[in-house]
């Protein structure tokens, strides 16, 4: 009986491969690699919380939060990390609000960044789909879902009702995109805003625009919030930011991390390293002082962060020791640094 089942299945597999091509169906054990390849986010703490060393390749990722919370900054860091690993990226600026000077300060290679400011939601998503199907991109960012205005709404009169148009547009686009992303190994990052539902008595009134499709299709959803200001004396130099991973299909969800976003600089690698280093016992904190072994690296968090920025050899030594404490070998370390090959 078992032999008959095996023969019947082999016949079915052969028929599927003749019709749809070799590799259209296979046993999971036959795949060369089952590890989820990733692109670093620029924050060591967030990479670890995501469980695979960053945002997964070949998947849809949603970053949402209030205004000025760091959504675009996080997306630009992912682009910078993809480029640093030798990859290509695109930024579709539906809001028409990208600051190239800030993007360059974060580390984005503007010379090799593909950039578009589309006229409508349909145009933006068609451009994204064409780029993804080329198979050449590592990451594409759409900023933002709320700004993907359907053509009918643009051409209509102010005040006209267009109920459900954007939700239908997103649903159709994501159905097309999801398969192309998986085949190409491209990560699609959708930035989204927050809206409030009227008349909600219990639970959170907050929701994201664009319908339910993005919530279903996204493998990772990150809620990013500004939770405090970073000061140097009386001057505010950055924001303390919290990210909650509200959905994760590739690792356990609901993890929360905090990191620093410095004005004009982006996510502070050194600040993130301090947090993870203390957590892993590599860096010692006594009162206001931070120390690495016998060496004091600063009094106060900002001074310790500056010390690590000015002494890259000590920063790299601490990073290596943190990886060792976490039990990460060379291959996993490459993934955390955003240099893993995409799984096609």
From Swiss-Prot:
GO terms for biological process: DNA recombination; DNA repair; SOS response. GO terms for molecular function: ATP binding; ATP hydrolysis activity; ATP-dependent DNA damage sensor activity; damaged DNA binding; single-stranded DNA binding. ATP binds at residues 65-72. SUPFAM superfamilies: P-loop containing nucleoside triphosphate hydrolases, RecA protein, C-terminal domain. Keywords: ATP-binding, Cytoplasm, DNA damage, DNA recombination, DNA repair, DNA-binding, Nucleotide-binding, SOS response. It is found in: Cytoplasm. PROSITE patterns: RECA_1 (PS00321), RECA_2 (PS50162), RECA_3 (PS50163). One of its GO terms (cellular component) is cytosol. Its main location: cytoplasm. Belongs to the RecA family. PANTHER family: MITOCHONDRIAL DNA REPAIR PROTEIN RECA HOMOLOG-RELATED, RECA. HAMAP family: RecA. Can catalyze the hydrolysis of ATP in the presence of single-stranded DNA, the ATP-dependent uptake of single-stranded DNA by duplex DNA, and the ATP-dependent hybridization of homologous single-stranded DNAs. It interacts with LexA causing its activation and leading to its autocatalytic cleavage. NCBIfam families: tigrfam_recA. This is Protein RecA. It comes from Rubrobacter xylanophilus (strain DSM 9941 / JCM 11954 / NBRC 16129 / PRD-1).
